[in-house]
Amino acid sequence: MKITKNKILKNKKIINFKYQKLLDLFYNVNNQKKNNQLLSYLYSFSGKIIFSLTEEKSLKKILRFLMRHKIHPQYIKRIIDIKKEIDYFYMIEEIKNGFIDKKNNILFLCTKDLLPILIDDKYIGNIKKNTNNINKFNLSQLILNHPVMHIEHGIGRYKGLTTIETASIQSEYLVISYAEGDKLYVPVSNLHLVSPYTGTSIENAPLHKLGGDDWNKEKHKISKTVYDHAAQLLHIYAKRESKTGFAFKKNIEKYDLFCNDCSFKTTSDQNEVMKFVLKDMSKPIPMDRLICGDVGFGKTEIAMRASFLAVSNKKQVAILVPTTLLAQQHYKNFKIRFSNWPVNINILSRFQTQKEQDLIFKHTKNGRINIIIGTHKLLFKNIEWCSLGLLIIDEEHRFGVSHKEIIKKIYSNIDILTLTATPIPRTLNMAMTGIKDLSIIAKPPAQRLAIKTFIQEYSPILIRKTILREISRGGQVYYIYNKVQNIMNIAERLSILIPEASIKIGHGQMKNIDLKKVMNEFYNNKFNVLICTTIIESGVDIARANTIIIENSDHFGLSQLHQLRGRIGRSNNQAYALLLVNNFNKITSDAKKRLEAISSVDNFGGGFSLSNQDLEIRGVGEILGKEQSGHIKNIGFSLYMDLLKNAIDLLKNGKIFSVEKSLKKPLEIDLHVSSLLPSSYILDINTRLFFYKKLANAIHEKQIEEIKYELIDQFGKLPDFSKNLILIAKIRLIADKIGIKYIKSNNNIGIIEFNDYGSINTEYLLKMFQKEPKIWKMETSTRIKFILHLKNDYLRLKWIINLLRNLFKKNI
């Protein structure tokens, strides 16, 4: 819902107001002076103040800030709910700019007024660059004694964090134990060298000897075989690039009109992804793009816009879906979305009679059908097209290898757009290596709440309580039971347990007409509890259904659980997922891991994370075959993917592959300063690990700045040691881009050694030696020394950053 100043006070009690624009009242976490100005203004304003906020993350941050300063706003749904005795309120609505209602003496403030840093639309991460690190698992999820991989020393076991002080310098270290009890202490500034090990079960993970030669031998051996695999993948890529496709042209006026018909405001992620899709479709090379976004994040709208572009170019669109229910759902949505345009949309599934199917085939051939949405029937050999231009594959993980082979044969020269919430490992692998283009929608729609997930042993009392809570607020419930032969018994049992509920069943073995009727009735709220199989896993989108109960949840795959849970939480109401097991003590270890994973990922955008965790649970054989999976077991998935990506980059750029280039030694930094997030600042170890890893994996300075502001917002002013940590992260980032081998410095001298001078501004380097010969000295052909007397660590680090920026040829 969008609110304007003319609309927000539309209630009869408050009308005809005069308004004035606000002064500069930004809440800026990096500027205490402005904070004080804002607070002073809020304290002194004589009337009511309403904070009109939308994004959940921003809402929490603003409320925390206000409460720290003794301002406790009360939540209201409507303007008329304001109370005389209270001065501060907040509501979940969207206004573009804050203003003052002078007539009623009300100050309205929006998110934009308070958090310009965090919602600046100009900063949208480059999707391709961000995906470079998608195979880097989150270190904050590390568990004591679980395997980790250090790129230089091999696979050991994580033993926690420890703070060590030497010569008055404090630093925090990640501790890894190796064979024979040896321990490695990794400075937190070097966490980019560490990743959780994934390749086989925890129990069977290798354990290397610290200082031994086995690890280096293994890396060298595998890096050679990786080259062959890289060449194979590049052959696939080159084959795709050599094909001739159709270059779509955009009629800007028509396209903008279609976009304006959208009933909701698209997120910045959706807009950015659509730019990539439009760019792909405009090229005379067939598009092959994977869009990964959680359920309900707006992938369908992107598919609709791509379809509109295709139809505008007189091309047909095929939308391939795994289930009849999803086909029905898309058919309804596409019909509504294209209702203002002369576009003929049809559906092909088992719900159509043979006569209807024959007519559809006829109209597909003669071009009367512009967009067809169908199940596996779209893969029939006898289907002919007039002018097919775009294939959209939804829920790609539901299609098997045989289906993929048919798609390759039938649809080899057209644009392909793949949509998924949980990509299968093979697709994930191709996306990670850049063979398949990848876009991620990570930002949820405004006002969407994360689903609360609970895992419990079976309990009739709990089931009754859960269902009654939902139907008492006018909602609906999915009850998943995946054995058709017993589903009637479940319905009888629930009818006795909850007589207040109206219950019906739905499953894939019902007659088409009966299943269609049940689903339509549930959609139209004719009953409130649907007992069904996983038939609703894809394609059911009902805003009122906000509770799902899954019996025998330990029998489901991780992707299945995520998809089922995604059927709820599509409105602004809090949604609940109850996963039931018969006996915790009797479920398998893999089932426990799946349930732990699904319950831990209740945040938005969890599908991608779950794909990685699914990979960890099931192993990697599915991705690359037996030989490669054996290599991955020996060195871990993360390093294997790094080696593969390095090999692909070398081959793409026409460089000669060498083991040395593939396994270049990581940058070493030793700056003799205290740099850590003290436990007095962040108590929780995993939270500290999370921020350490974020800093270590940053690929832009702007990302480091964002992390800095995130720390300040959540935990307050940065301690001096933490300021040093931020600066060292920037030094590492720039030094790595230049090609520095190591950089060492104390308060008196410093040494920089280069791998090569490829990215160095040699002109600037020569000027330094000529201008300040007492400071600079060339020790070897690749090593320079500088003499520096700065006792303040912070100033010294800033000086080094400035030096590195000047040394870098390109603008960082």
From Swiss-Prot:
GO biological process: regulation of DNA-templated transcription; transcription-coupled nucleotide-excision repair, DNA damage recognition
Annotated protein name in UniProt: Transcription-repair-coupling factor
Swiss-Prot/TrEMBL keywords: ATP-binding, Cytoplasm, DNA damage, DNA repair, DNA-binding, Helicase, Hydrolase, Nucleotide-binding
EC id: 3.6.4.-
Gene3D superfamilies, alphabetized: 2.40.10.170, 3.40.50.11140, P-loop containing nucleotide triphosphate hydrolases (3.40.50.300), Transcription-repair-coupling factor, D7 domain (3.90.1150.50)
Keyword Chaperone annotated: no
Subcellular location: Cytoplasm
ATP-binding in keyword set: yes
GO function term, MF aspect, one: damaged DNA binding
Residue stretches making up the Helicase ATP-binding domain: 280-441
The organism of origin for this protein: Buchnera aphidicola subsp. Acyrthosiphon pisum (strain APS) (Acyrthosiphon pisum symbiotic bacterium)
